[in-house]
A protein has these predicted regions:
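Conserved short alpha-helical segments that host acidic/polar catalytic motifs at enzyme active sites
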Residues: 1-245, 249, 261-292, 331, ...
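Glycine-rich oxoanion-binding loops at beta->alpha junctions
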Residues: 68-85, 272-286, 309-345, 351, ...
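Catalytic-loop motifs flanking and including active-site residues across diverse enzymes
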Residues: 125-128, 305, 309, 405-410, ...
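Extended hydrophobic-aromatic, low-complexity segments
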Residues: 181, 305-306, 322-323, 352-355, ...
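Generic C-terminus detector
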Residues: 226, 541, 554-556, 566-607
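Active-site phosphate/pyrophosphate-binding segments
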Residues: 259-263, 267-295, 385-514, 587-607
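Glycine-rich phosphate-binding loops that contact phosphosugars or nucleotide phosphates
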Residues: 289-431, 435-438, 518-561, 582
Length: 607
């Protein structure tokens, strides 16, 4: 949530800031702004409510800041409504800042400063930080930042410039992510790697309360007490092309089509002699035997990947698995022990609730395993064990390929757990692994049938509300399909276990209401068909996602998407693809901004 970019170098700073902020649009925002040192050393600020295009148009009308050092920001409103005044950057006297996070004690700090005669122009917690920095300023930016952050409670990533230190950018963080990009005679700060890929792949990870100083001589980093520290240079394994659309109309469509490659890249290094091998992740069969319970903790789409994992691990390994929403897990006072494994799933590795849940689990003695896509992220660094998914950058807010590789990893874990528990033998495991390796080819074939998903989408665009139903693994899929549709089409959608319809939900069915039924599980197929007939008889317009071999009668479905025959257990990896495409094309046909849906952020870094 929110995006921060900063630059010091010889390039046109405004161009660099706008380009970087464009690469961070996926994080979600409702306003944008930049602050740039002019050639004479003055700070020029331009900011606007709305999209980056609105900011660009405003600069064209009112004047474009020019210079070689500055900071930029895309804001997601948390304190104060979206407006020009509340947009970042915020200036307090001699200090101008951009901020990602939430300052929990901003009201107390504001009251303290107000009592000292300080006045405020906005409703934001960010301006409070700017005014506090100015109030504390003693001529030494590093000392002032160090003294000020000790008074801040909550989370923050800050880009800071001081009026009397032209062409120098300062940065610090606590909980909220921030990196320092290292170019040739230029340097950057950014909330995420894609913002700097056009210029460099090298960067530092800024640790908690460290202070970075960027000037024309390079970068220096200090700890919270002003002592210089040596940093390890890291190199991103993504290139600029990975963060571009590559000829697709939207990032989401590109990322849906990248799923076969992402699966191969993620699972191939973890398979040896036809069996799962997670030793590189410090996961061995011997270690897995010690766990008597598993908790999967995540948010949104990642949580849905955990539900698939729950079904598969319990079925194969016979180990009890509980799936928790991270924000609920933290506050329900979970009972944990050293015999429990807590699996944290997060694409960004910075999801605030998931990070806090993991820390809680560690404090209570449980072992933690992180499944993340972003290298060097907070969750990745703090987990006891770690599996990286190799999806590459996922720019669209609605997750697709990250979900796919998350469930691929959950399958590998399930196979490894089952082998360790002795509930399957190596022959059966090799068969399952071989089928998992076949999924990319099957998905590639499914992606060729876009016309059917477009046709289905055209039947949904006027709907006000719809339901997704399924049983077992199909119910897990219906949860993800429903979320995808509501995220980007803005159609109200809910998922329900098909067997629960008669317990209240069926009262919602009205004539012409769309119901998307997922029925891929052979063992549950007839029962699901019975549930489908019940909603069809009450006027529902049914879209059936099932195996291609089944030909539904008129009393079962109006439309069908057929899937190849495949192992029940692995069917989610195939069946989710048409659900993704249906959501995508529905959104496109409704004229929505698919990659940047309203009110949503890609990485939720505040609670």
């Amino acid at each position: 949530m929110c995006g921060i970019v900063g630059y010091v170098g010889s390039r046109n700073c405004t161009d660099v800031l706008i380009n970087g902020l464009t690469k961070l649009e996926y994080r979600g925002y409702d306003s944008a702004g930049i602050a740039v040192f002019s050639e004479s050393g003055n700070i020029q600020v331009a900011k606007s409510k709305g999209r980056l295009a609105d900011l660009i148009h405003k600069m064209e009308r009112e004047g474009r800041p020019e210079g070689h050092a500055g900071i930029g920001h895309t804001r997601w409103a948390t304190h104060g409504e979206p407006s020009d005044i509340n947009s970042h950057p915020h200036t307090g006297g001699r200090v101008t800042i951009v901020h990602n996070g939430i300052i929990e004690n901003y009201k107390e700090l504001k009251e303290y400063l107000s009592a000292k005669g300080v006045t405020f122009a906005s409703d934001t917690d960010t301006e409070v930080v700017a005014r506090l920095l100015d109030y504390n300023y003693n001529g030494s930016p590093i000392e002032t930042i160090s003294n000020t952050i000790r008074d801040l409670e909550g989370s923050y990533a800050l880009g800071i410039i001081f009026a009397d230190h032209p062409d120098v950018v300062y940065a610090t963080r606590k909980e909220s992510p921030l990196i320092v990009g290292l170019g040739k005679e230029e340097s950057f700060i950014a909330s995420d790697v894609p913002a700097i890929l056009r210029y460099t792949r090298d960067y530092y990870l800024l640790e908690q309360e460290e202070i970075a100083v960027l000037d024309h001589s390079g970068v220096k980093v200090y700890d919270a007490y002003g002592v210089e520290v040596q940093k390890e240079r890291k190199t991103a394994d993504w290139d600029m092309d990975a963060a571009e659309k590559g000829g697709y109309a939207h990032f989401m469509l590109k990322e849906i089509h990248e799923q076969p490659t992402a699966i191969k890249t993620t699972i191939t290094p973890r398979i040896r002699d036809g069996l799962p091998n997670l030793e590189e992740c410090n996961i061995t069969p011997e270690a897995l035997k010690q766990y008597h319970r598993i908790f999967v903790v995540a948010c949104g789409t990642a949580m849905h990947a955990g539900v698939v994992g729950q079904y598969v691990i319990e079925k194969l390994a016979r180990i009890p698995v509980t799936v928790d929403i991270a924000s609920e897990f933290r506050y329900r006072d979970p009972i944990l022990s050293a015999e429990d494994l807590v699996i944290i799933i997060s694409q960004s590795g910075e999801t605030a609730d998931s990070l806090a849940a993991m820390r809680l689990a560690k404090n209570r003695g449980a072992k933690t395993l992180a499944i993340v896509n972003a290298k060097g992220s907070s969750i990745a660094r703090e987990a006891d064990m770690l599996i990286y998914t190799h999806a590459g950058p996922e720019i669209a807010v609605a997750s697709t390929k990250a979900y796919m590789v998350q469930i691929a990893v959950m399958y590998l874990l399930a196979f490894e757990f089952a082998l360790a528990a002795g509930t399957i033998d190596e022959t059966e495991c090799r068969k399952l692994v071989a089928e998992l390796q076949q999924t990319p080819d099957y998905i590639s074939e499914i992606l060729k049938n876009k016309e059917q998903t477009q046709f289905i989408a055209s039947s949904l665009i006027t709907a006000d509300s719809l339901l997704y139903i399924g049983r077992g693994l199909d119910y897990a899929l219906s949860m993800e399909g429903s979320l995808k549709l509501k995220e980007i089409s803005y159609i109200h959608s809910e998922s329900y276990a098909a067997g629960e319809l008669k317990h209240g939900t069926i009262s919602l069915i009205s004539d012409g209401m769309p119901v998307i039924a997922v029925a891929t599980q052979k063992a549950l197929f007839e029962k699901t068909i019975s549930n489908i007939k019940e909603v069809k008889a009450r006027g529902a317009k049914v879209v059936l996602v099932c195996r291609d071999t089944y030909q539904p009668d008129a009393d079962v479905a109006d439309l069908k998407f057929g899937l190849p025959d495949f192992d029940d257990l692995l069917m989610p990896m195939l069946a989710v693809v048409p659900l993704q495409l249906i959501a995508y094309y529905t959104s496109v046909l409704r004229g929505n901004d698919v990659d940047k849906p309203r009110n949503l952020a890609k990485s939720v870094t505040v609670e």
